[in-house]
Every structure is written in C-alpha cells, then in structure tokens.
C-alpha cells in the first residue's frame, strides 16, 4: 500500500455549544459546515493553511454517533485522502479486512468516504476520503 496523505482528524462533539467552546478555546475558525445525511450529523471543518491539517467536528443530531463514547463525544477517527475509495476497499477486503459501508457514501465538502473498521486499524477508526471531480 502506498503512503497516504492525512486529510483530517475527526472529533465527535455532543452539541453545537461544545463545538463552539472548543473552537474558541483553540482559536479555530469555521471553513464550512454541512449536514451529512448518512450519519445524521452536522460536519464542521476548520480553516487551515496549506501545510496544516483541518479538524472535523462531527455534531450528531441523532443516530449512532449521538451515543458515541456514552454520549460524551471525543476523538473519533483519522482520515486519509485517496484517489479511489472503492479501489482501497477492494484492496483491504482482498486482505480479509472489512469497511463500514457497502460502498462509499457522500461526506461534507464534495467528498465520498468509507471507514476501515477499528479492529483492522489497530484500534483506530480510519476514514478514506476521495475528493469528487468538479
């Protein structure tokens, strides 16, 4: 497998208020926020410079992410940018690993995503991100 570029770090926040406090505490600003239907969450990405990695604050409105870490939120995933999410899925599955979704789902900001299950990522939930062509 070739080297993958870090795309973002995902943190689940159990409320918009907590997300706002986190942003203020660390001098972060919103780049964009979008509702992601497949995860029933508002996903906020921070502004960042060219050589920096953004943070994604996932604010679940309902569903499984609302109960993440007993409803407290916290560190959730790291995301790598890939050319082709479906090709990555095929490669990992050929090695006996499983991803969360049957096929990639839309994410915030013009991307599609899928996640490697934590038991195959050494305990870490790993997201694969493919930017859609404009």
Which residues are covered by each model-predicted region?
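Vicinal oxygen chelate
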Residues: 1-2, 13-20, 25, 35, 44-49, 55, 70-119, ...
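Long, hydrophobic N-terminal alpha-helical segment
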Residues: 1-39
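Extracellular structured ligand-interaction cores
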Residues: 6, 75, 125
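Short, flexible, solvent-exposed loop/turn segments with mixed acidic/basic and small polar residues
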Residues: 1, 65-70
């Amino acid at each position: 497998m070739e080297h993958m570029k870090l795309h973002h770090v995902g943190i689940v926040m159990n409320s918009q208020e907590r997300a706002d406090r986190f942003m203020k505490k660390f001098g972060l600003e919103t780049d964009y926020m979008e509702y992601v239907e497949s995860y029933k969450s508002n996903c906020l990405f921070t502004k960042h410079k060219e050589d920096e990695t953004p943070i994604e604050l996932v604010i679940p409105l309902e569903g499984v992410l609302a109960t993440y870490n007993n409803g407290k939120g916290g560190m959730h995933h790291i995301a790598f940018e890939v050319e082709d999410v479906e090709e990555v899925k095929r490669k990992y599955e050929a090695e006996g690993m499983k991803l969360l979704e049957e096929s990639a789902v839309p994410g915030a900001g013009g991307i599609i995503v899928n996640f490697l299950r934590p038991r195959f990522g050494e305990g870490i939930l790993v997201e694969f991100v493919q930017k859609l062509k404009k």
